[in-house]
Structures are given as C-alpha cells and as structure tokens.
C-alpha cells in the first residue's frame, strides 16, 4: 500500500495522526510532498519532496509513473520527454494569455453573493477544490461546485438570467459532458463564463497529450484570477478566520 500526502506546513495534526496510525498498523509506504523544508510529515515519509506550490503537478507526475510501471500508460516516456522540455514554459504562456481575461473576471465577480462552478473529468477535482479551498477558504466567498453530468439533475432549475456560473471544459473523454452544459447555459443565463483549455496553446505538446494537461491549464488560468480577486476584494488569501486560530 502506498499513501501520498501533500501539506503546506507539514504539521497538520489530523494528517500527522493519520500517517502515524497508517505506518504503525498497516505499514504503508508514505510519499510526502511538503512545502516546508523541515516538518513532521517529512520525517514520517519514506520518500519526501520539499518544494512549494504546484501540488497538482506533483500528484499527477507520481500517478502517471505508477500507471506506467503497471503497464497502463504506453506513451509515458515520449509524453514526459515533451513535458520535461516544453510544459513549464507552456504554462507560463497560458498565464500570460489569461491575464486580461482574469482582470475582467475578477472585476465582474469579486462581490458575487454566490458563484457556481461546473466541471467534469480530470477537471472535476480541480473544480471542487477551487470552489472550496480558494473561493470559500481563502477569499470567503460563497460557492457551489457541481459535476457537469449532475448539472441537469436539479441545479439548472435555480439558474436565472443573473446567476454567476463558471464552466470548465477539458479535453479528456468527459469533455462532451461539459460541452453540453456550455451549449445549454446561454438559453437561461447571461452571467456565465466558459473556461476551455482548448483555447490555450501548449507549444511543443502533441495534441494527443493535451488531455492529460487540461487541469494544469485550468490551474494556470485560476492563478491569474486569484491575483486579481485579491486586488478587487482587498482580501489577502493568506488570512483565515478560524483555521489555526481556534481549536476544533
């Protein structure tokens, strides 16, 4: 059994307790990604990488390697040869291209009473965490995240002309689910945004590998949105009301 953890501080009590229990009772191999250079979770890890930010990239690089070792990712070596050579610069260029859009998005949505985020496939985890961990936790803005396939199972009945809705569209097998939402939403709403990874060039990356990177493109776009949301809200994303301030 392998357990992969990611932590900024490396000392979150609940995670520390969980890893101690896992190592004592199961004997799992632990891979620790921790932003801090020294931390308890680094000490508990069998394999450890101390490097800040880019959690998604770290996780997917490890997951891809596991799949390759298990014979489930035939193009791994060719794909990662391209990623190693081109991906870093390509994602920087995504952020540059997204900048004007991010400015306008933040100006439009910084004071939303409620914002809905929709995504599917390898975009879904990022959609869920962006709504909860960024807008709710870090910006104190109310959100709801929903999968594209569930959009038509209730949620669309509360969408009106003014409802803020952002739809993320990736390039994997579940793209049609998000396209369906994007094609429908203009009929009922005038306050929607579509963020499609296909709109962003990834220079040097083969078309067949883009599906593996949709969520990284989304993260790059969101990085720029976050910068301008901080400016518009006058709210630094580092501050918290309750986390590490109150016992719970």
Task: Show where each model-derived region lies.
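Glycine-rich phosphate-binding loops that contact phosphosugars or nucleotide phosphates
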Residues: 1-87, 168-193
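Short, surface-exposed amphipathic charged segments that create phosphate/polyanion-binding patches used
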Residues: 2, 62-66, 159-161, 205-214
